[in-house]
Amino acid sequence: MRQGMQRFWSWMAVNLGRHAGLVGLIGLIFTLVLGFGITRLEFATGQDSYLNSDDVVYQDNVQYQELFGGQALLTVVATEGGATVDSLFTPEGIATFTKVADRARAVEGVRGVISPLTALQFSNSLIQPPAGGTVFDAIATKSLVQAKEAATAAGDAASIEARDADLVTTSTRLLAIPQDQQVLTNPEYVKFLLYDNEGGIRKALKPFFPDDTHALMITRLDGNLSIEAEGVAADGAVAAAKELVIPGTQVTTTGASLLLQDINDYLKGGMLTLGGIAVAVMAAILILFFNVRWRLLPLAVVLIGVIWAFGLAGYLGIPLTLVTIAGLPVMLGIGVDYAIQMHSRIEEEVIIDHSPHPIQEAARGLGPALLVVTFDAVFAFLAIQLSKVPMVRDFGWLLTVGIIAICVSSIVNPLAALGIREFRSPTKGRNFSEGRLGRLVVWLGSLPAGAAIPLAVVSIAVFVGGSIVEPSIKLETDPTNWVSQDNPIIKDLRSVADQIGGDAELGVFVKSTDGQTLFTQPVVDYVDEFTDRELAANPDVLLNATSIVATISDLTDIPGAKPVAPEAATVQSAWDVAPADIQTSTASPDGTALNIIYLTKPGSLEDRARAVTSIRDDANPPQGTELVPSGLAVVGTGLLENLEGNLVQLTWLAVGLVFLFLLVRLRSLTRALLSMVPVLVASGLATIAIFALGIELSPMTAVGGPLVVATCTEFTSLILLRYIEERRRGLEPRAAIDITASRTGRAFIVSAMTAIAGVAVISTSSLPLLRNFGLFVAIKVAIALLAALVVLPPLILWADRRNWVSKGMLDGEDAPFIDVADHADSANALS
């Protein structure tokens, strides 16, 4: 088996170099064909990127948005100079509200618009009697009378007295305005509609008039749109809202859809930007520290591999998602190591060993090791498939495909390019193993074998310590903190929250399970009681609620009187006379679904998750109905739950899969364990460092663990396999570890710098969401690589003194090299 593999690598080395021109031509065609696959890449931005299609939350949200629409844009109109909201309803103001709402409704992707004028028109419909009726036939009057009758039936004297007094005052105010002057152009009538008998904004209107100096317009987008389509619709709605110009007011329009679109736009362009920065940094590192001929060749090799990777992703249907922005710099950082190792090994064979067959030697020695570390990475990335988040799993597939493509490129292209180069112009130079980088790696690994046991004890302590502090590391779950606080959208969101107390929505819908209408008394009673109960139970999250039931219930909410649920027939009548946009946002046309919309206060997804849990736990709807929380807040909390659900398990699965692979491939428990020890050290020490530095983790750290496992085991496996190779040459353990360090030191240090730079570049992002992820992974990778260079050598020495490392690996004859015909005086260099 061993000789067969050696013959294969020799054959590859000879023929790739001998036919370098043909290899280059085939490679170009192959790159063009695979590169075309990049044009087939799609950016997945729907909610199916965050939630699994078989998740109940996903299915409920799809149904909810089909019924009641998608995200809401909030347009806040703030009066200035001591003016109050009633001053908005001049003929000019009414015309402006009408024009802006009509233009917004005409935007493709907008489902409906409820302006302050719409809310007042609805109130007017409730106050005014039907054609041919009297004031006692008006819906508002009926609801007040019914509330008094309920108090009378209950014998509640205090409520009766309070309701009588309120009804008298209300009637007096209304009757003071002649019937023909009860129109929205009459300032006195507008004041009657807006203000209750105590002079405050009527409770039923608070969702649209939070106080007497602010009015709110809600633009509802179509449901189940992608982020791109949502963004286009939001842009159109914002453009319409810019025409909401009323003298003496300040207008602000914002919403979650604008924030998501902004993040999405950044991520699309950001991947190339960060990738470009990573390329520039890596080029600088190679120029300054990688003292070889054609020192930028590894970068070219990995860029070809990246083209293959993204092209394959396009052909395989692997989508790009919000997480994949990390893909390009990560693949560059990890993948360039392969090309650096191959390049350095070839020059080592030429310059130091003066091998008659340097390309074959390099291919035989490093080729199998590169395959091992590639499988290390593949198994680490396959662990990401355990994630409950679709876009994280897609990222795992992208990395898996990418690392395989980069490995192939890093073997084929250097063997061909450097093979023909060494054939035509052999490299000459001094022994680089005595250089600064080689000496540094020898020094890092110079601890004696006797240090192995203390190191093992310290490693265990560090790992345990990291496990203890890990739960204390804060995970940033407030979406507004995922982006730069200088972002205009964030400033608008915070401004809106400061003005009206909330900036987002939490939707809850009650649906019939038997196809019957929900405009029944049991359901109306339940919705009324549930709405108020959840507001009281979650005061830190929920600001107010609006629904067709809440509107009528709030009309009868009188100080000093016990709340009374409205009659179902009255609620049905109110919905029948409501403007179309209010109808579509509060109930389905057939009455089998009712919507409750809570305005939520600023806060984290964790805060909202607690409210969602409370709603689910307290539901207990009437028979024949089901209550379901939904909307963006629920999608966000579902995403958070999925991310946190197996955050630690992803890392442990990556460790377990890589360990099992190494156990099989290296045929030794000791060799497999040695490869994994630095990973555990790095995990614990990095966690402690992150905790001590106070770095807040972002949700993207879900993929950080497997990335660190892949990077660290790549280095530990290369060190271990090179050590065994030197032992096979007859060197004693100490000499073998020193030769390994000195000869591979340059490649390891340069590789370490490029790997760290690749992920550290992400920390230069303007998005804290990415910046903290980049810091998290860069710190872990740096510590992991340092652990591999410091901790692994003494452990290897200690174990090999007991013949646990080299056992079974030193026997067997090598296959002869392939002889190559002379060409000038450098024929042997080709081989």
Residue ranges and their predicted role:
Residues 1-28, 408-463, 481, 728, ...:
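Interfacial helix-loop-helix hairpins and adjacent transmembrane helices
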Residues 23, 38-88, 94-95, 99, ...:
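Solvent-exposed, non-transmembrane loop/terminal regulatory segments of multi-pass membrane proteins
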Residues 66, 156-292, 525, 538, ...:
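Extracytoplasmic
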Residues 99-208, 214, 250, 539-577:
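Alpha-helical transmembrane helix bundles of large polytopic membrane transport and channel proteins
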Residues 269-320, 386-390, 650-698, 764:
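Interfacial segments of transmembrane alpha-helices in multi-pass membrane proteins
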Residues 271-273, 299, 338, 351-387, ...:
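Pore- and gate-forming transmembrane helices of large, multi-pass membrane proteins
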Residues 285, 371-413, 418-421, 659-662, ...:
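Hydrophobic, glycine/alanine-rich multi-pass transmembrane helices and their short helix-loop junctions
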Residues 286, 302-303, 319-340, 382, ...:
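Hydrophobic transmembrane alpha-helices
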